[in-house]
Structures are given as structure tokens and as C-alpha cells.
Amino acid sequence: MLSHRDLGLTDKEYEKIVELLHREPNEVELGMFSVMWSEHCSYKHTKHLLRDLPTSGERVIQGPGENAGVVDIGDNLVIVFKMESHNHPSAIEPFQGAATGIGGIVRDIFAMGARPIALLDSLRFGDLKSAKVKYLFSGVVSGIAHYGNCIGVPTVAGEIYFDDCYTDNPIVNVMCVGIAKKDEIKFARAQFSGASVMLVGAMTGRDGIHGASFASENLSEKSQEKRPSVQVGDPFMEKLLIEACLEAIKIEGVLAVQDLGAAGLTSACSEIASRGNKGIEIDLAFVPQREKGMTPYEIVLSESQERMLLVVKPEYEDEVKQIFQRWDLYSQKIGVITDDGLFTVKMNGKIVAQVPTKALTEKVPVVEMSFEKRVNSGNADVPEPENLQETFLKLLSSENICSRRSVYERYDHRVGINTVVLPGSDAAVLRIKGSSKAIAVTTDCNGFYCFLDPYEGAKIAVAEAARNLVATGAMPVGITDCLNFASPDDPKVAYQLKRAVEGMAEAARFLRIPIVSGNVSLYNESKKRKIYPTPVIGMVGLIEDISYICDAAFKNEGDLVVLIGENFSESACEYTKVIWGIDYGKVPSIDLEVEKRVQQVCLKAIREKIVSSAHDLSEGGLAVSLAESSILGNIGVICDLRANIRRDFVLFGEQQSRMIVTIKKENLPLLKKIAEDNNISICVIGRVAGKKFIISVNGEKVIDLNIDEIREVYYTSLEKWVNE
């Protein structure tokens, strides 16, 4: 029998288990506690930090604690969304790790009764010069494309960053968004004693056993031995499961639905019973098994994919079975909901484990972390480049700025025919069939900023996500997050985690955007490297009328280019990192009051229908944002930028709370009025014209290129980096 230490439990945790059970646990029970009390399932390091996040609001139907968050968008419609990580599995088996990450997050959405309509992925990899990184990159992208394309859910947005700190630990965060009717939402709460517990979907095998525990430890040289802990997905089975579950959920007698993800039956059964303050009894002999001779330990801990747990009134069992039979899926009653508060596991009628449900879900000892502030070395002495045009082209072609088109072209981003604004803009926009409304979705986080200052970096991540939505004409209505950090046992990492959560909370609270779901992924480090603190923000926004939809592409010859939020800085940025190799300094400052008013100006102008295009300023600064809008619109721009700081930082600095919009000349007075009403400065910096990309600084021309030249650099560089 494995010891508690072999399973990742501490001596203190084992003593707590004995106290809760009033006896020593047997092997099956010990395995159940090991997965449920793993960091991945229990959040034992972060529970107390996450309590400070703003999770309520007038639109919030369901916050954290369910399969996904739910936000009301009116007309009896809700958005259901969540983000999760699949970092450790993707580091070991990138194709299946990423693919099953997609499968798991999609199940969280339709478990709530919502039809999945969009996927997003936020990815981080190491230096592309490494053969290992190229292997991981190729496998992850292929896994996402394979699974997402096969299930018919479009991958519409996301982000990819490269940095050496992610070489051993790629970050694979996936987000799914669904739409449902408000009165058809289902919850994972078993509140009816005597109800049948049905396992539906695929058969159970030995794949993924202890996957949750594996995801809660540092990677090492021995991690490759844990490839069996990586689940294997079948997207065609998932597609059948989506349709069957959405049909079954409409039955009155289906009371609760729970995805089987991390920790398999152990997690699904204990959580669905615990939320309803009930007990649950199952017999593993009734679980459809695809492998012979599986032990109770293996069955109850298996993380085989494409499985769901349904709580059903007994008289509706046959109706549910008929639906799943029609979709060629297994459906089997494996147990009942009880009043005793216990999770009883039997095998052929004999009890093999019996544990209080809340002991598994709520009684894990919280880990008290030690905190130590990392000392920032201050601003660097940045040289000034001689040739700003060459510098611009080098920056535009760099891994973190060049287009991701070669990646998103592999994803079917149009399936479902809802995608209105395609990948490549600030955010994706999807129509809602049968409604005049639309939704915008995005993911954002600059890990470099968070490394330099986790508090300010996390605030910036929230603010930039909101700016991206506003640029499409959307009002931000909800956040999901994925907190990716190294080992919290390191006081400096614990400090980063604490400050990042505080920064997220402040920005979300100030901008009045509730955080309704999320995920924590810790221990993303190896002996050689720790990842940057990477609190990824997923955000959804509501566009009240499809006539308000805006994108980043320049459109009309002669339109004025207007900068909203006229400020510049000489802070650390992608320019200082890429061009000069400086990976330290002070992050760009952000004033949340200014940020809020800049967003209000842009959104009001879009709703007044005077804006032809809108674009957020982020990595690469003003020059890169202008280039992106020119490339997207296939039309040139002539700009003259005026500022009292160095020319390179005028072009490439990343001061926050700035956006560029294009308008017709006759609409400038109205835009000025909107800006004045919000006490925000604006400045006409140029006009849309011809096929040239020309930028002057204080009257001196510093960039003069053809649109075709910058398009070639922008669109082809990533593929060159991958293939060289």
C-alpha cells in the first residue's frame, strides 16, 4: 500500500484525515483524499486570498463555486464562461494535454445547460530557438486545433507569448463561453434524497489516474514517467456528449449535472453531494469499464475523458437512457443520493470506502504561506537606436508582437456561423442567434509586467482586457481568471501570488467587473526555471446592439486618427526587452480612474456611431498599434507624433490607458465634447491615406514604408521563428 507521502499528502494532512474519519484510512480512501486535497482541487494555498475578489454584481447569476460563472445579459439570456489550465499535462504530452484541456472546459459549460459557442486559448512557451519548445508549441497548437475543430466549437481568440522562463513549463489556459436561457440553467447540487446517480458518456479506463496530484507538483526529470497521468481525449465522443446532455438537461427530472474532470468520480460525486448538503452512495461494479481487472482504486480515481454525472429522479431514468442510447453513448445508474452526508463507495455491494463528503471538499487544512518581497532593480539606462525604422521592423517581427495568423488559421473560427469579428483584432465578437445583441471575448496578461511588479501587472491585465472589449463596442460584464505561478512554498512566489490577486481585485472592483469563475495553477517550475507570475484574465463583454460592433481595421481614406489618452512614458516594455535585452525596470503606471474614463470616451463614441475603427495600445506601443490597424485595413496612414520625451519611447513606449480611433473630420467636435465631458485629453495624430506607412516624431520623418512591406513582416515572422 502506498503511503500518504507517496501520494503527496503531508504528515499534518494525514493526521487531519485520521481525525476526520476517527480511524486510519484504507488505500482507496487515502487515494481519494490525495486527489481532493491536492492543490489542483482544493486551492489550499489560495482559498483565503481568493475571498477578496469581487464576485457579485447586478448581472451575476452564479459566481465561483459551480462548474462555471453565469452572467445575465437580458432578454432571458445568460453568458456561461470559465477558464482553466492544463499546464502540467501539456508539458509532458502536449497534444493530448492541450486537447483534453479543451474537452474539460467545454464540459464545464454544457454541464450548466449552456451551448458552447466559443473557445479561447492563452498560451506561453519558451524560446523558439529550442527544439523542445518547438515540439511543445507544435503539439499544443495541434491538440487545440484537433479537439476544437472536431467538436464544432470555434476557437475565436487568445494570445501567445514566448519567454525563456516558460521553456520547461508551458502555460496552456483554455476558456469556453456558452449561451443559455436564464430559466434553463442547471447547477451541480444534489438536493433530492433518493435520486438516482447516473454516469453517462464514455467508458472508464486507467488513463489520468492521479492527474490532479500530478498537476500539483513541480516538474522534474521524472515527470516523463507520469505520462499515464495525462488523459486521452476523443473529440467525436465529446460532440455526441454535448448534444445528448443538452437534450437530457431539458428533462424536468434531471436535477443536477457535473463534469468528470480532475479526480474523476471522486471529485464529481463528492462535490455534487457536498454542494447539496447530501450524501452519495455508488457501486463501482456498475461503472462501464473499457479495461479488464480494474480495481476500486483505479475506477474511483480514473480521469477518463468525456464522462458526466447526472442526478435524476428515478422515474425519469429510462427517458434519460433512451436519449444517450440514441446518441450511442453509455448511461448507467451507479448509485443514489442519500441523507447521511457520507460518500460511500461499494464494489459488488461491499463497502470499499466511506468518507464524509465535506471532509473531501471543505476540510483540507489551509496552508499558511510566508511572504518575501522581490527587490526590483529599478529602471535601466536604455541606449537610443540610430535607425528607428529598422528598430520598428525588428520589433514588429519579434515573437511576442508579430501576427499569430499562422496559428489561428489552423483553428476553425467560423464554425457555428456566429463569429463577426475574427481573430487578429482586439477581441472576437460573436452574434447571438435570434437576438440583436452580441458578445465580445478576450484573454490578456503580460507576465513580464507581473514579474516586475505583480500588483501593477495584474491591474494592467484587467484594464487591458477591458480596453480590448471596449474597442469592439462592448461593455465588460464579467471576468474569469487563471492564476499561473511557480511554487508557493517559495516566499517570493507567494508574495507575487498575493500581490497579483490584490491587483486583480482592485482593478476589477474599480472598473465594476465581477470575477465569476477561475482556476489556480501552481508549481509551474523546474529545477532550472520558475515561470513569470502569469494571472491570465478572460473577459466577456456585452454589445447591446449589433450595429455598435467595431474593429481595429482602418477603413476610410481621409479619416482622422485620434489618440485617446495622450500620455507617454519611458518604462520597461517589449521594446526595451527585445531590442536591448533589458529584462528589468519599472512597469508602465496605470491610473484606474483615467483608465475608466478613457474606456467611457471610446465606448460612448462608438455608440454615437462616429468611430470607424478602434484599437487598444499595448505591446509595441503606438507604432505597432498603428501598423496593426493599417495591415488589417490594407490602407496606409500618415502620422506626426508630438511629445517631450525620447523618440523611441514615443513610438514604442507602453504607457497604459490609451486607444486610437479613426473618425471622419466632421465628427471631431462631437468626439472632443465626449472627451471633455470625461476630462480626458485627445489628440489628432494623423490621417488614413494611400498605401504608405509614415510616422514622424516632432515633425521629423522616422518611418516610411509601404503597407506591403510591414504586412509581410507582420504575417510571416512567427512561421519563420518556428521553422528556422
From Swiss-Prot:
Write down the top EC class of this protein. Answer: ligase
Binding positions (Mg(2+) 1): E84, N519
Binding of ATP occurs at Y43, K82, D481, G518
- Record key words, sorted: ATP-binding, Cytoplasm, Ligase, Magnesium, Metal-binding, Nucleotide-binding, Purine biosynthesis
The pathway where this protein functions is: Purine metabolism; IMP biosynthesis via de novo pathway; 5-amino-1-(5-phospho-D-ribosyl)imidazole from N(2)-formyl-N(1)-(5-phospho-D-ribosyl)glycinamide: step 1/2
Q: Which GO terms describe its molecular function?
A: ATP binding; magnesium ion binding; phosphoribosylformylglycinamidine synthase activity
Q: Where does Mg(2+) 2 bind?
A: D108, D259
An example GO BP is: 'de novo' IMP biosynthetic process
Report the record's disulfide bonds.
none
Q: E.C. number, please?
A: 6.3.5.3
Any matching Pfam family: AIRS_C
- Sorted alphabetically, which HAMAP family does this protein's record hold? PurL_2
Report the protein's function. Answer: Part of the phosphoribosylformylglycinamidine synthase complex involved in the purines biosynthetic pathway. Catalyzes the ATP-dependent conversion of formylglycinamide ribonucleotide (FGAR) and glutamine to yield formylglycinamidine ribonucleotide (FGAM) and glutamate. The FGAM synthase complex is composed of three subunits. PurQ produces an ammonia molecule by converting glutamine to glutamate. PurL transfers the ammonia molecule to FGAR to form FGAM in an ATP-dependent manner.
Q: State the name under which the record lists this protein.
A: Phosphoribosylformylglycinamidine synthase subunit PurL
**What is the originating organism of this protein?**
Pseudothermotoga lettingae (strain ATCC BAA-301 / DSM 14385 / NBRC 107922 / TMO) (Thermotoga lettingae)
Q: What is the lineage of its organism?
A: Bacteria, Thermotogati, Thermotogota, Thermotogae, Thermotogales
